[in-house]
From Swiss-Prot:
Classification via Gene3D superfamilies: Ribosomal protein L14
Transmembrane region(s): none
Descriptive protein name: Large ribosomal subunit protein uL14
Phylogenetic placement of the source organism: Bacteria, Thermotogati, Thermotogota, Thermotogae, Thermotogales
Function: Binds to 23S rRNA. Forms part of two intersubunit bridges in the 70S ribosome.
Organism: Fervidobacterium nodosum (strain ATCC 35602 / DSM 5306 / Rt17-B1)
Keywords: Ribonucleoprotein, Ribosomal protein, RNA-binding, rRNA-binding
Pfam families xref list: Ribosomal_L14
Listed GO CC annotations: cytosolic large ribosomal subunit
GO BP, sorted A to Z: translation
PROSITE patterns assigned: RIBOSOMAL_L14
Subunit relationships: Part of the 50S ribosomal subunit. Forms a cluster with proteins L3 and L19. In the 70S ribosome, L14 and L19 interact and together make contacts with the 16S rRNA in bridges B5 and B8.
Family per record: Belongs to the universal ribosomal protein uL14 family.
Gene label: rplN
Length: 122
């Protein structure tokens, strides 16, 4: 579960390293976000000499969470970290690579570009 002030690892090569959630988008009082949700984040750490700087406000989609999510078949999936991929204004990934596994739920939410860039889909 991702909420305001949660820290996320950037799972792409956009230039951000660590993100802090400002707001979970979707609904007027949406408190928690999970895999496939879009969040507004502040960049807390960034790679030098890239477009994204520390303090920038960006949109990102959550691709991994420590909190397990239940699938329709009754199985559960959870990951070792909370991670997100930085998005541009068209909700496409800003980076050209995605690191680590991503959840299959991203395909159902319409993030096909992220699924195709990921090394493995769980």
């Amino acid at each position: 579960m991702i909420q305001n002030e949660s820290y996320l690892v950037a799972a792409d090569n956009s230039g951000a390293k660590v993100l802090r959630v400002i707001r979970v988008l979707g609904g007027s009082h949406k408190q928690f976000g999970t895999i496939g949700d879009i969040v507004v984040c502040s960049v807390r750490e960034a790679v030098p000499n890239t477009d994204i700087k520390k303090g920038d406000v960006v949109k990102a989609v959550v691709v991994r969470t420590k909190k397990e999510i239940r699938r329709p078949d009754g199985s559960y999936i959870r990951f070792d970290d909370n991670a997100a991929v930085v998005l541009d204004k068209f909700n496409q990934p800003k980076g050209t690579r995605v690191f680590g596994p991503v959840a299959r739920e991203l395909r159902e939410k319409g993030f096909m570009k992220i699924v195709s860039l990921a090394p493995e889909v769980w």
